[in-house]
Amino acid sequence: MKENDKYEQFDVGEENNKTKRSKLDADQRRKYRIIIILLILVSLSLAIMLFCSKRKNENYQNGPIDKDSLKFLLISDLHDNEDSLALLLNKVKQNKYNYIFYLGDFVKMTPGQQNSTEHANIYEERMKKYLQKFEQIAPVLYIPGNNEPYTIYEKNSPKLTEISKNIHNRYIKIKDDLYIMGLGGCVPILNGGKYDKNVIPFSTLNTSNVIQNGFPYNLPEYGLDNYKKSDEWYGNDIKNIINEVKKDAGNNQYQTILLSHNGPLYSWTNAQQQLGTGEHWLYLGSMELEKILINDENLILDIHGHIHPSRGINTMIPGKTVINPGAIINGFYGELTLKKIDNKWTVNSMNLLEF
C-alpha cells in the first residue's frame, strides 16, 4: 500500500468515527430534550394541581370574605326529606360560605332501629349522600341529632366523606382564636307549665316529669331522676370538650361556638307549646347547657336545632346568642356572619331565611 493510501484509509476511518460520535451525540441530545420536556410537563402539572388545590382550600376554608370575617350556612332537621334538600340547595347554590353547620337529624329512625347494626349501615349511606350534596356548597361540620344510628355518636364514628367532619363530642379550630365545639343528641323532654321567656327559673321546673326519652342521653334506670342524671351526663360531655379546648389554646386568647342539637333548657328557641293545652309548654333542652352558657366567658354562641317550630334568636343571657335556624323539612334555614372587631369575634349579621 502506498503511503498516501495509508493516510487516505486513516482519514476515512476517522470520518466514520466522527459520524458515529455525531450520531451518538444527536441521540443523547434528543434524549436530553425529551427528559427536559417531561420534567417541564411534570412541573407544570404539579403547579396546576397545587394551584387548584389552593383555590379549593381557599373556597372551603377561607371562604368568600376577608380574613376577619366568616360566613356560615345554618341548617338542621332534614329527616330524610329529599325534596326539601333539593329546594334548599337550589336556593343557596350561588352563595359562598366558609362552612355549613349542620345541627342534627339528617335521617328519621325509630328508637328500635337506632341501635341496630343492620340499620346503621343503611342510614350511614343516606347521611353520606346528603353530605356529598351539601359539599357542593361548602364543607360541613355536623353533629347527630336524636334520630341518627348509634355509630355516629361513637368516639370512632365512621368517616362518611373526605371533606366534612362529625364533631360530636369533639372540637375543631377554624381560626387561631376560634374553636367550634360539637355535641349532638338530646336529653329527655320535660312536661312543664306556663312559660315565661324572660325568666330562667332553675328551681321551679319539675325535673321528674319526663314525657319522652332522650337519645343517647337517657338513663331511665334512675326513674324520676332520669332527666337530672341524663342532663348531668350531657353537661359533663360539654365540660370535657371545653377543657380540651383550653389545653389546646394554652395561654392564648380564644372564643368558642357550640353546635348542639338541643339547646339550653329555658331558651324560647328550645321550648314548644303543647297543642290543645293553652299555655302548657314542653321543655326540650338542657339545664346544664344553660348554666355553662351563663358561666363560660369564652362561649359566645350556641347554635341548635331539634325544635322545629321555635326558630329564632335569643340574647337573654348577656353577651351570649342562642340561635335556632329552624328545620329544613319546614323550609327554614339561617345565615350567620361573624366579624372580628377589636380582636373579638362578634355576630355581624344573623338572618333567618326560608325557601
Regions found by a protein language model. Name each.
Residues 2-74, 78-86, 93-95, 136, ...:
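Acidic, histidine-bearing metal-coordination/catalytic regions of metal-dependent phosphoesterases
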Residues 62-73, 171-182, 253-257, 314-322, ...:
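Beta-strand-turn-beta hairpins that frame and shape the catalytic cleft
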Residues 72-82, 107-122, 190-205:
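Acidic/histidine-rich helix-loop elements
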Residues 74-77, 100-105, 139-146, 166-169, ...:
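Active-site neighborhood of phospho(di)ester-bond hydrolases with catalytic His/Asp-centered motifs
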Residues 82-175, 283:
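Core catalytic region of metal-dependent phosphoesterases/phosphodiesterases
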Residues 107, 113-124, 250-298:
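Active-site-proximal segments of metal-dependent phosphoesterases and phosphodiesterases across multiple
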Residues 171-176, 287-296, 308-355:
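Binuclear metal-dependent phosphoesterase catalytic core
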Residues 179-280:
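Active-site-proximal loop/helix segment associated with metal-binding centers of metalloenzymes
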